[in-house]
Amino acid sequence: MTTEALAPLVSRGLVAAGLATEAELASQADWLSSLIELLKVRARTVDDIVHQARPYFGQSVTYDEEAVAKQWKDKDATRETLQATHDALAGVTDWTLGSTETALRAMAESRGVSPGKIFQPLRVALTGSAASPGIFDVLVVLGRDRSLARIGGAVGRLGPGSI
């Protein structure tokens, strides 16, 4: 089904789930289309898309405790990695797939770690889950301010230190 055909169905589901109002969705039609395009790949039904869309609404994140336990095992190291991730992304002004990817891959290289050591903890910080679309897609769909706020919230959840 095309994104255009899915949009009204997904919109009804999002409103019914209390994630947004019709007016909010109408004012963000392009953003909603981008989100649907991103999520429909992993979905079989409209309800699947609505469920997958939850992390993209609101300011806070509901963390899957299994994802937290697996991806944030070493809280101090994860906090430090997410703080460094925040710092690297805070310097990105042109928030695109390419610019966020460049910043994070450069950070991984400068730290001598594989990108996955950064991307997986970041995925949990942004979506609360260990599974999501590509991390750069997630960053772009969430937007700069919300992404940085969620990373900061994750750092705070992990203990001492602040952004």
Model-derived segments and spans:
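Short amphipathic alpha-helical segments with coiled-coil-like heptad repeat character
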Residues: 1-5, 130-133
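Small-residue-rich helix-loop
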Residues: 2-111
